[in-house]
């Protein structure tokens, strides 16, 4: 089942996934909750959308600061995942940029392709917005647009739309100053320029040159419109990782943004136990397996020895930045916002489950078991673990059933539960806060008997597929929890993930069995 409660009323992108966890559709939204919810309301859909909804088994989302950023991020995610349901719906062209060429008298133009020469700004999602910005900058700074310098002044010069470098009406130095200001505006650094223009406007008004003052006023208004920054796609030639976290109840909730050449391409989230040097330990483990970026943006500084370690792994200097203001600080804050919304929206699910099941503590670690087989062959068990309300795939486990002949889900559940928790006890690892069994009262009873033999005292429930009924040991009737309630939806989400994982393993074993063996 799809639990929509975790979605915020904020702009961002959503990623629909199928039974195998593959991204099949990427969309953007001004309001994530409203947009995603609209798919699952009971109403008629066109055949393509109906097919999409039928295939959806889960989703992820990334919050952005603005709808414009959501547009840009959507474009990036589509090109990364190439989702099945986006291919025929999205234009494969890049959004157009504004280009200042690299010439003695640079010209301003629109371009969909970023070449090596000159400066590029954007891209812009809306053609209307892009054209508006282009015209404002071109007109304000009277920049040339002609491909070749004409030998005589054109109409644009005569209507004061161009400064006329072709006829020597402006020096190269003065023209370069105009280009510099235009670039500053296109980068979003326009506050000082606006203040200067406001001063000029007041002087014009004091001299009763009201027409010129009003024209300047309109240009200032146009420039102010440009101040909305596009954090998701910046002009960087190097890669950045942006990391932020929250520590709560001795647990670290961490978000990692991956920025590739100025474009936010991915987010990764982690939940683990708090320790005195948790950040150092995380960075060492993560970057021992993943190449460090050119720049690492963090909420706190690192020891010099750790920076040296990262540089050694990369083979070149890694820059560590702790921004206090500006665009990088905004991205760091955006990562934190995603931690708060992504993880602590999930906390509400945990609290609902704790309340409905009368659990002694918040079920921060939940393990769920499922059995999958095909006509009694390739019978496998799966176990998924949710930590902090989210899948912790590092702790997923697969079990090839060894002691059961034919179809016997009860005996199969007993085997995987016995193997899992006897191993945890032997290795002296922590037990989960809740165990879920995919099945009815029979599977629940089998699991309960094995746990009792092992003297494992962990809350145990099962969920039956058809009516999504939840059972606990010792009570014949299902718990009075409606399948549409938050607690039930969360259990269904976990069960569906265990089922998906089991089916994936089952398919893998069947494929291997079909490969001829060499004599």
From Swiss-Prot:
Belongs to the UvrC family. NCBIfam families: uvrC. GO terms for molecular function: DNA binding; excinuclease ABC activity. It is found in: Cytoplasm. This is UvrABC system protein C. Interacts with UvrB in an incision complex. The UvrABC repair system catalyzes the recognition and processing of DNA lesions. UvrC both incises the 5' and 3' sides of the lesion. The N-terminal half is responsible for the 3' incision and the C-terminal half is responsible for the 5' incision. Keywords: Cytoplasm, DNA damage, DNA excision, DNA repair, Excision nuclease, SOS response. It comes from the Archaea. PROSITE patterns: GIY_YIG (PS50164), UVR (PS50151), UVRC (PS50165). GO terms for biological process: nucleotide-excision repair; SOS response. Residues 191-226 form the UVR domain. Residues 9-87 form the GIY-YIG domain. Its main location: cytoplasm. It comes from Methanosarcina barkeri (strain Fusaro / DSM 804). InterPro entries: GIY-YIG_endonuc, GIY-YIG_endonuc_sf, GIY-YIG_UvrC_Cho, UVR_dom, UVR_dom_sf, UvrABC_protein_C, UvrC, UvrC_RNase_H_dom. Pfam families: GIY-YIG (PF01541), UVR (PF02151), UvrC_RNaseH (PF22920), UvrC_RNaseH_dom (PF08459). GO terms for cellular component: cytoplasm; excinuclease repair complex.
């Amino acid at each position: 089942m799809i639990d929509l409660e975790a979605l915020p009323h904020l702009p961002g992108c959503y990623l629909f996934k199928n039974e195998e966890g593959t991204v099949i559709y990427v969309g953007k939204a001004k309001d994530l909750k409203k947009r995603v919810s609209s798919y699952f309301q009971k109403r008629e859909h066109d055949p393509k959308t109906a097919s999409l909804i039928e295939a959806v088994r889960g989703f992820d989302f990334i919050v952005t600061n603005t709808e414009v950023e959501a547009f840009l991020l959507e474009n990036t995610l589509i090109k990364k995942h190439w989702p099945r349901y986006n291919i025929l719906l999205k234009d494969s062209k890049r959004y157009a940029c504004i280009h200042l060429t690299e010439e003695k008298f640079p010209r301003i133009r629109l371009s969909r392709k970023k070449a090596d020469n000159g400066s590029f700004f954007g891209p812009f999602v809306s053609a209307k917005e892009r054209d508006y910005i282009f015209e404002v900058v071109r007109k304000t700074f009277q920049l040339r647009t002609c491909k070749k310098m004409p030998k005589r002044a054109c109409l644009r010069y005569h209507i004061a739309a161009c400064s006329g470098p072709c006829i020597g009406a402006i020096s190269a130095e003065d023209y370069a100053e105009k280009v510099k200001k235009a670039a500053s505006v296109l980068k979003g650094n326009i506050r000082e320029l606006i203040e200067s223009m406001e001063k000029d406007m007041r002087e014009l008004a004091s001299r009763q040159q009201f027409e010129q003052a009003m024209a300047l006023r309109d240009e200032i208004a146009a420039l102010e419109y440009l101040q909305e920054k596009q954090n998701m796609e910046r002009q960087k030639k190097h890669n950045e990782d942006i990391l932020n976290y929250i520590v709560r109840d001795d647990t670290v909730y961490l978000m990692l943004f991956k920025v590739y050449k100025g474009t936010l391409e991915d987010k990764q989230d982690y939940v683990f136990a708090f320790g005195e040097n948790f950040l150092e330990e995380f960075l060492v483990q993560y970057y021992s397996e993943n190449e460090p970026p050119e720049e690492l943006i963090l909420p706190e500084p690192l020891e010099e020895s750790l920076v040296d370690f990262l540089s050694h792994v990369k083979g070149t200097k890694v820059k560590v930045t702790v921004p206090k203001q500006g665009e990088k600080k905004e991205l760091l804050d955006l990562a934190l916002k995603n931690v708060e919304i992504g993880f602590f929206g999930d906390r509400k699910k945990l609290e609902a489950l704790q309340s409905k099941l009368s659990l002694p503590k918040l079920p921060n670690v939940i393990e769920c078991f499922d059995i999958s087989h095909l006509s009694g062959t390739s019978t496998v068990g799966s176990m998924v673990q949710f930590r902090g309300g989210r899948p912790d795939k590092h702790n997923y486990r697969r079990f090839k059933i060894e002691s059961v002949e034919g179809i016997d889900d009860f005996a199969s559940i007993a085997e995987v539960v016995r193997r899992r928790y006897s191993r945890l006890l032997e290795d002296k690892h922590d037990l989960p806060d809740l165990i879920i069994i995919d099945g009815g009262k029979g599977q629940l009873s089998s699991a309960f008997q094995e746990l009792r033999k092992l003297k494992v005292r962990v809350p145990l429930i099962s969920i039956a597929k058809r009516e999504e009924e939840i059972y606990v040991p010792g009570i014949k009737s299902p718990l009075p929890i409606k399948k549409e309630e938050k607690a039930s939806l969360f259990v269904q989400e976990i069960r569906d993930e265990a089922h998906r994982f089991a089916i994936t393993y089952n398919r893998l074993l069947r494929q291997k069995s079909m490969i001829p063996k060499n004599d």
